[in-house]
């Protein structure tokens, strides 16, 4: 496992969820956090953390994200070719865009492509828009790009 300098990376919280367990004495809450980390130079990863408190869940998610970092092959400020990838019920379509287009992405795909360092891209989320699966599908697509 490669060690990364955490100062080079930015982190974005994509989703924080709350789960409630009802017990005799009342309700017990637990939290989940989905975090994307990237250095805007072609390295990006995501992590999932669960804990009884939000800050603990976020810390676990960031630690998990550094275990799942992938290298993205860029062509200038965009991607080399079109790609469509399916992860569970989520499908994501990524298309290269000309200079000046910007990042056209929504939901969980936007933080992934921005933190990967892509400046011009068109994305379309097809199928399920579950943010965790969209993030996973986007990272899977970026890792499958051929330079």
From Swiss-Prot:
- Listed InterPro entries: Ribosomal_Su5_D2-typ_SF, Ribosomal_uS5, Ribosomal_uS5_bac-type, Ribosomal_uS5_C, Ribosomal_uS5_N, Ribosomal_uS5_N_CS, Ribsml_uS5_D2-typ_fold_subgr
User: Which GO molecular-function terms appear in the entry?
Assistant: rRNA binding; structural constituent of ribosome
Xref: Pfam families: Ribosomal_S5, Ribosomal_S5_C
UniProt keywords (A-Z) are: Ribonucleoprotein, Ribosomal protein, RNA-binding, rRNA-binding
Source superkingdom: Bacteria
Q: Which GO terms describe its cellular component?
A: small ribosomal subunit
Biological process (GO), any one: translation
NCBIfam families referenced in this protein's UniProt entry, alphabetically: rpsE_bact
Q: How does it assemble?
A: Part of the 30S ribosomal subunit. Contacts proteins S4 and S8.
Q: What does this protein do?
A: With S4 and S12 plays an important role in translational accuracy.
Q: What is known of its domains?
A: The N-terminal domain interacts with the head of the 30S subunit; the C-terminal domain interacts with the body and contacts protein S4. The interaction surface between S4 and S5 is involved in control of translational fidelity.
Protein name (record): Small ribosomal subunit protein uS5
Upper taxonomic classification of the species?
Answer: Bacteria, Pseudomonadati, Campylobacterota, Epsilonproteobacteria, Campylobacterales
Q: Which gene encodes it?
A: rpsE
């Amino acid at each position: 496992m490669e060690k990364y300098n955490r100062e080079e990376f930015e982190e974005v919280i994509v989703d924080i969820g709350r789960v409630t367990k009802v017990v005799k004495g009342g309700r017990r809450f637990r939290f989940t956090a989905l975090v994307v980390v990237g250095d805007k130079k072609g390295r990006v990863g995501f992590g999932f953390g669960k804990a009884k408190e939000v800050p603990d869940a976020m810390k676990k998610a960031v630690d998990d994200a550094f275990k799942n970092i992938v290298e993205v092959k860029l062509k200038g400020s965009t991607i080399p070719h079109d790609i469509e990838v399916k992860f569970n019920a989520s499908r994501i379509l990524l298309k290269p865009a000309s200079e000046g287009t910007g990042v056209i992405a929504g939901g969980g795909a936007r933080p992934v492509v921005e933190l990967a360092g892509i400046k011009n891209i068109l994305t379309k989320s097809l199928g399920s828009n579950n943010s965790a699966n969209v993030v996973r599908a986007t990272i899977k697509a970026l890792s499958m790009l051929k330079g």
